[in-house]
């Protein structure tokens, strides 16, 4: 099946950050086979031609760190620091989850993400009360591209920890698929919730199965103080001593890093998922993304969960990310629009090991989203496309979402998820949780 999308303004995110006016994209099954400008007069025979009527077409956004199973917990822990937020709000409520609640919560997060332009994401879920196979089936049904990882903790007894490791290893062996629509990573929660033995076992699983690692690290000053007091090392050095960086690793946050740590992370191919809104809301601080990029670290933008954000709008994250860097460095050139877009598309895809997506180029997967600026005053005059995408647009502006060549959202309607049912069930299940 070959489909041509014509009469579009195409934000390619290729090496030149080329924007093609009056362009077209040809998709064969799940791949892009041509991207060009001008009237469509290709040598390719196509089955369908779709007039985009001047819409902006850009790569699907890539969310490098989130927790969709927590989507029912939106708004339950506002105005709290990380540790009390986790200990008095999040973990007690997650302990009440059932497989049905977890699926309903996941569906809500998936629906929000895909309708706001996210096509790929990396996720960590707490396995308590969760049917992991049902979660993976739900993500698959959404049509999204994802790395969904089972989180490990050292809560309970040593026997509980051993069982958690065994279950996580089985999960990795079952779901790791580097080039598929769904894959996974090894995901110890953090150095303050995992024992040294558990972190070492996670490193072993990652090496033996050739997977990536995903962990919260260097998120707060308190974490750094506590880990240094307990182990005599800061979190980066401690994680490295446990062997976690033997495989490509994504650290969520990296708010509290010094120059030596940034150089070390770059040398060991440790990538950072940058969560600006969540870090601000939890009072964790502001990550120095400018310094990370200058050190050579791969960085991708992320939302974290709705419980700490409180939405999954990657356009908002792009805008906040670039404004924060300009503000803390008192440098208006810090994190320009092209870089911000890269950190939410091609660069983010590289961070989570999904190089097959993130830009609109021949050979890449057909993952793209559209915005119709014609009826949106906040996107006018419409000729400054890149600026508007970062500084003016929002997830509410999305018209269409194509993932792997399939129309997942079309004219604002999600084709893979039942929006009315999901919203109804989310409210019903939320009322059953006891604070």
Curated annotation (Swiss-Prot):
Coiled coil: none annotated. Its cofactor is Zn(2+). Transmembrane segments: none annotated. The keyword Hydrolase applies. GO terms for molecular function: 5'-methylthioadenosine deaminase activity; metal ion binding; S-adenosylhomocysteine deaminase activity. It is an enzyme of class 3 (hydrolase). Gene3D superfamilies: Metal-dependent hydrolases (3.20.20.140), Urease, subunit C, domain 1 (2.30.40.10). Its EC number is 3.5.4.28, 3.5.4.31. Substrate binds at residues 94, 150, 189, 219, 304. Pfam families: Amidohydro_1. It catalyses: S-adenosyl-L-homocysteine + H2O + H(+) = S-inosyl-L-homocysteine + NH4(+); S-methyl-5'-thioadenosine + H2O + H(+) = S-methyl-5'-thioinosine + NH4(+). Keywords: Hydrolase, Metal-binding, Zinc. Catalyzes the deamination of 5-methylthioadenosine and S-adenosyl-L-homocysteine into 5-methylthioinosine and S-inosyl-L-homocysteine, respectively. Is also able to deaminate adenosine. Belongs to the metallo-dependent hydrolases superfamily. MTA/SAH deaminase family. NCBIfam families: PRK15493.1. This is 5-methylthioadenosine/S-adenosylhomocysteine deaminase. It comes from Bacillus thuringiensis (strain Al Hakam).
């Amino acid at each position: 099946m070959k489909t041509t999308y014509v009469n579009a303004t195409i934000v390619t995110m290729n090496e030149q950050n080329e924007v093609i006016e009056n362009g077209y994209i040809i998709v064969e099954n799940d791949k892009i086979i041509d991207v060009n400008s001008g009237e469509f007069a290709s040598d390719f025979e196509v089955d369908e031609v779709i007039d985009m009527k001047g819409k902006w077409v850009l790569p699907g956004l890539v969310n490098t760190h989130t927790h969709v199973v927590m989507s029912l917990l939106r708004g339950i822990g506002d105005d709290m620091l990380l540790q009390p937020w986790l200990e008095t709000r999040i973990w007690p409520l997650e302990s009440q989850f059932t497989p049905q609640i977890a699926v309903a919560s996941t569906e809500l997060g998936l629906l929000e993400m895909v309708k706001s332009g996210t096509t790929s994401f990396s996720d960590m879920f707490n396995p308590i009360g969760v049917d992991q196979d049902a979660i993976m089936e739900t993500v698959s049904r959404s049509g999204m591209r994802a790395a969904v990882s089972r989180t490990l903790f050292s809560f309970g007894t040593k026997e509980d920890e051993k069982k958690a490791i065994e279950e996580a290893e089985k999960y990795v062996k079952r779901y790791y698929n580097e080039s598929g629509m769904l894959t996974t990573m090894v995901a110890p929660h953090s150095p303050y919730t995992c024992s040294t033995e558990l972190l070492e076992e996670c490193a072993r699983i990652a090496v033996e199965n050739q997977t990536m690692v995903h962990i919260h690290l260097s998120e707060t000053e308190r974490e750094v103080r506590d880990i240094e007091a307990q182990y005599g090392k800061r979190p980066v050095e401690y994680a490295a001593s446990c062997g976690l960086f033997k495989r490509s690793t994504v650290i969520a946050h990296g708010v509290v890093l010094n120059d030596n740590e940034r150089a070390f992370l770059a040398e060991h191919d440790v990538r950072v998922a940058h969560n600006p809104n969540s870090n601000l809301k939890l009072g964790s601080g502001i990550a120095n993304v400018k310094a990370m990029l200058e050190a050579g670290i791969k960085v991708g933008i992320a939302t974290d969960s709705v419980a700490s954000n409180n939405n999954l709008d990657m356009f908002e994250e792009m805008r906040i990310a670039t404004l924060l860097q300009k503000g803390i460095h008192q440098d208006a050139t810090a994190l320009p629009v092209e870089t911000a877009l890269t950190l939410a598309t091609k660069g983010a895809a590289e961070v989570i090991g999904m190089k097959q997506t993130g830009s609109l180029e021949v050979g890449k997967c057909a993952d793209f989203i559209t915005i119709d600026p014609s009826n949106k005053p906040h996107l006018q005059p419409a000729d400054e496309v890149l600026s508007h995408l970062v500084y003016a647009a929002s997830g509410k502006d999305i018209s269409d979402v194509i993932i792997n060549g399939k129309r997942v959202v079309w004219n604002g309607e999600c084709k893979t998820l039942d929006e009315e049912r999901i919203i109804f069930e989310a409210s019903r299940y939320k009322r059953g949780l006891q604070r």
